Amino acid sequence: MSTRSVSSSSYRRMFGGPGTASRPSSSRSYVTTSTRTYSLGSALRPSTSRSLYASSPGGVYATRSSAVRLRSSVPGVRLLQDSVDFSLADAINTEFKNTRTNEKVELQELNDRFANYIDKVRFLEQQNKILLAELEQLKGQGKSRLGDLYEEEMRELRRQVDQLTNDKARVEVERDNLAEDIMRLREKLQEEMLQREEAENTLQSFRQDVDNASLARLDLERKVESLQEEIAFLKKLHEEEIQELQAQIQEQHVQIDVDVSKPDLTAALRDVRQQYESVAAKNLQEAEEWYKSKFADLSEAANRNNDALRQAKQESTEYRRQVQSLTCEVDALKGTNESLERQMREMEENFAVEAANYQDTIGRLQDEIQDMKEEMARHLREYQDLLNVKMALDIEIATYRKLLEGEESRISLPLPNFSSLNLRETNLDSLPLVDTHSKRTLLIKTVETRDGQVINETSQHHDDLE
């Protein structure tokens, strides 16, 4: 049985996602061609020829074409040699030429697009090289500059930390000294307060003695007044007695003049008067001496008590002044202590704020370094992706070159002349059933390239029936 199939193919480019990593040394591409042929025993149905090209995972290209074959819609038709229509062959030849022309135009467009894409890739490679050079330069400069800045910042921070530590130690020593002074002053204040209480107790006892002395003096003054009144009364009584005695003496003197023989009473009265005067003078002298002695004693006791009171007042005033001065000194020391504690807290807060700022600066510098590292890694990944795309494009260009060469060689083959067909009269229904199965041919083509050059190419054919 003779069978003939007419097939045509056209290539279309279908771009997938971005190219992934491929091996820079070599890559393999597979071309699978599936051809279906049908025997003339069945209806002359359309035949489909598919060609699938798979390269690196960066892209998938598939070409499909279909050509209309001779078809018989009536199963019982008999083909006769005299009724062959050669216009159908001319139509097929015309369609075949148009298909080949369209394929050439499509291949030319694909070549132009590939050329533009290659130019773009080269431009991107140049830009990538420039960016890599700038990145290396910035990396070298930035690393040294950041390292110097980091070291300088660290030295400054260490110096400030040491200074703050020394200031803190000095302030703590001053605080301890002030605390000791305050404790000593508090002890001294307690002692002074005890002495003040003792002085007040002594002063209270002295006041009681002074009160007792005042009462005794008042009592003595009353006694002196009573004695003075008694002395005045005695003087008055004595004067009256003297007057009476003088009157009696006058009477006796008169009587003496009359009667000379009477006894002399003047001498007796004189003696009595002298006796009374001596007794009165003695009593008066004794009273005056007793009064003077008592008054001297009371005056001495009063002076002594006044001296003790004045001394107690002076001591109390001195103690009060010392207490006030110590209180002022304690208040001043408290203010100084509070000021030093406030300064210490402010220094600690400033130190904490500066330490936090320096930590933020260090963290920011580390983040910048990490960002630069990530950016450098991203540039490297982009460069690697561009290299992978370049390798994939080199593989695709080599594969298209092979396909174009094969297509040109296939196009250059002479077409069969349908006018020379000599068909016998055959009954289509009498064909065996085995011929109704379709024959499938699987072509596996392996192309290995390196740096855009094809170094190995193999093909395998597998036939199976459907």
Swiss-Prot record:
The modification N-acetylserine is found at S2. Residues 103-411 form the IF rod domain. Residues 246-268 are annotated as: Linker 12. The modification N6-succinyllysine is found at K120, K129, K188, K294, K445. Its main location: cytoplasm. Vimentins are class-III intermediate filaments found in various non-epithelial cells, especially mesenchymal cells. Vimentin is attached to the nucleus, endoplasmic reticulum, and mitochondria, either laterally or terminally. Plays a role in cell directional movement, orientation, cell sheet organization and Golgi complex polarization at the cell migration front. Protects SCRIB from proteasomal degradation and facilitates its localization to intermediate filaments in a cell contact-mediated manner. Involved with LARP6 in the stabilization of type I collagen mRNAs for CO1A1 and CO1A2. It comes from the Eukaryota. Residues 154-245 are annotated as: Coil 1B. The record marks F351 as: Stutter. Residues 408-466 are annotated as: Tail. The modification Phosphothreonine is found at T20, T426, T436, T446, T458. Residues 96-131 are annotated as: Coil 1A. Residues 269-407 are annotated as: Coil 2. This is Vimentin. Residues 1-13, 20-32 have a biased composition (Low complexity). PANTHER family: GLIAL FIBRILLARY ACIDIC PROTEIN, VIMENTIN. One of the most prominent phosphoproteins in various cells of mesenchymal origin. Phosphorylation is enhanced during cell division, at which time vimentin filaments are significantly reorganized. Phosphorylation by PKN1 inhibits the formation of filaments. Filament disassembly during mitosis is promoted by phosphorylation at Ser-55 as well as by nestin. Phosphorylated at Ser-56 by CDK5 during neutrophil secretion in the cytoplasm. Phosphorylated by STK33. Phosphorylated on tyrosine residues by SRMS. It is found in: Cytoplasm; Cytoplasm, Cytoskeleton; Nucleus matrix; Cell membrane. Residues 1-32 are annotated as: Disordered. The central alpha-helical coiled-coil IF rod domain mediates elementary homodimerization. The [IL]-x-C-x-x-[DE] motif is a proposed target motif for cysteine S-nitrosylation mediated by the iNOS-S100A8/A9 transnitrosylase complex. Homomer assembled from elementary dimers. Identified in complexes that contain VIM, EZR, AHNAK, BFSP1, BFSP2, ANK2, PLEC, PRX and spectrin. Interacts with BCAS3. Interacts with LGSN. Interacts with SYNM. Interacts (via rod region) with PLEC (via CH 1 domain). Interacts with STK33. Interacts with LARP6. Interacts with RAB8B. Interacts with TOR1A; the interaction associates TOR1A with the cytoskeleton. Interacts with TOR1AIP1. Interacts with TOR1AIP1. Interacts with DIAPH1. Interacts with EPPK1; interaction is dependent of higher-order structure of intermediate filament. Keywords: Acetylation, Cell membrane, Coiled coil, Cytoplasm, Cytoskeleton, Glycoprotein, Intermediate filament, Isopeptide bond, Membrane, Nucleus, Phosphoprotein, S-nitrosylation, Ubl conjugation. Residues 2-95 are annotated as: Head. The modification N6-acetyllysine is found at K120, K129, K139, K168, K188, K223, K235, K294, K373, K445. There is a cross-link at K104, K120, K129, K139, K223, K262, K294, K313, K373, K439, K445 (Glycyl lysine isopeptide (Lys-Gly) (interchain with G-Cter in SUMO2)). Glycans are attached at S7, T33, S34.
